[in-house]
Amino acid sequence: MSVSPVSIVSTPVAVSASPAGAPVQPVTVRWRGREAYEASFDAMRAFTDTRTADTGDEIWVVEHPPVYTLGQAGDPAHLLVADSGVPLVKVDRGGQITYHGPGQIVVYLLLDLRRRKLMVRTLVTKIEEAVIETLAAYNLASVRKAGAPGIYVASGVHEGAKIAALGLKIRNGCSYHGLSLNVKMDLRPFLAINPCGYAGLETVDMASLAVAADWNDVAHTLVGRLIANLDGASAAADKPHALEQSND
């Protein structure tokens, strides 16, 4: 998350319940537009490091220029083409290597898990369910895979191909990083890596599955499902705006 591949890195913390009757604040959704990965990475770490018990939870929606990200225990050998021209950024999430680029929705979840009384595994399940429900809204069947967080095509010619990646970091009981969903993108950069550390893993987007979906429409559907799965509440107002999508 980056949006990011397949595992969760967690700093040990006791996940305790919020005080009895304490309301959970609504999630604020921030539509950050096209943004360099490093800018998002620095901003989410700063947000997490400076938040207090009263800081509201946020969901950031962004589209990145081409970039590979490698998890903190990732093996650089999974980058198969060293001179691809796509920059590589080492990050503090779990998992191996993944790719972000235009036409992909990246969502960062900046949540206080203790206040929400959420265990990490439950959060992962809620995120995966939101992606599955979003794809179902476009008549695409998708599934989880045991031991490999992310979402995969359920049937057809591309059965087993990965369409969404997931990777989180938990610090002081709060999450950052998040998920990516491939809508309509140039998939060739995935051929220069072992996606999420799996040699030969096929990666697809919604366009590969004959769905001509608009990036903004899918993003709004996905955010709606995430918020509904987290707490059923409405997001705090931060007016969404259309992003300019590149077909590069």
Swiss-Prot record:
<dbReference type="Pfam" id="PF21948">
    <property type="entry name" value="LplA-B_cat"/>
</dbReference>
<protein>
    <recommendedName>
        <fullName>Octanoyltransferase</fullName>
        <ecNumber>2.3.1.181</ecNumber>
    </recommendedName>
</protein>
<keyword id="KW-0808">Transferase</keyword>
<feature type="binding site">
    <location>
        <begin position="178"/>
        <end position="180"/>
    </location>
    <ligand>
        <name>substrate</name>
    </ligand>
</feature>
<keyword id="KW-0012">Acyltransferase</keyword>
<dbReference type="InterPro" id="IPR045864">
    <property type="entry name" value="aa-tRNA-synth_II/BPL/LPL"/>
</dbReference>
<dbReference type="GO" id="GO:0033819">
    <property type="term" value="F:lipoyl(octanoyl) transferase activity"/>
</dbReference>
<comment type="pathway">
    <text>Protein modification; protein lipoylation via endogenous pathway; protein N(6)-(lipoyl)lysine from octanoyl-[acyl-carrier-protein]: step 1/2.</text>
</comment>
<feature type="active site" description="Acyl-thioester intermediate">
    <location>
        <position position="196"/>
    </location>
</feature>
<keyword id="KW-0963">Cytoplasm</keyword>
<dbReference type="InterPro" id="IPR000544">
    <property type="entry name" value="Octanoyltransferase"/>
</dbReference>
<comment type="function">
    <text>Catalyzes the transfer of endogenously produced octanoic acid from octanoyl-acyl-carrier-protein onto the lipoyl domains of lipoate-dependent enzymes. Lipoyl-ACP can also act as a substrate although octanoyl-ACP is likely to be the physiological substrate.</text>
</comment>
<dbReference type="InterPro" id="IPR020605">
    <property type="entry name" value="Octanoyltransferase_CS"/>
</dbReference>
<feature type="binding site">
    <location>
        <begin position="93"/>
        <end position="100"/>
    </location>
    <ligand>
        <name>substrate</name>
    </ligand>
</feature>
<dbReference type="InterPro" id="IPR004143">
    <property type="entry name" value="BPL_LPL_catalytic"/>
</dbReference>
<feature type="domain" description="BPL/LPL catalytic">
    <location>
        <begin position="53"/>
        <end position="238"/>
    </location>
</feature>
<dbReference type="GO" id="GO:0005737">
    <property type="term" value="C:cytoplasm"/>
</dbReference>
<feature type="site" description="Lowers pKa of active site Cys">
    <location>
        <position position="162"/>
    </location>
</feature>
<feature type="binding site">
    <location>
        <begin position="165"/>
        <end position="167"/>
    </location>
    <ligand>
        <name>substrate</name>
    </ligand>
</feature>
<comment type="similarity">
    <text>Belongs to the LipB family.</text>
</comment>
<dbReference type="GO" id="GO:0036211">
    <property type="term" value="P:protein modification process"/>
</dbReference>
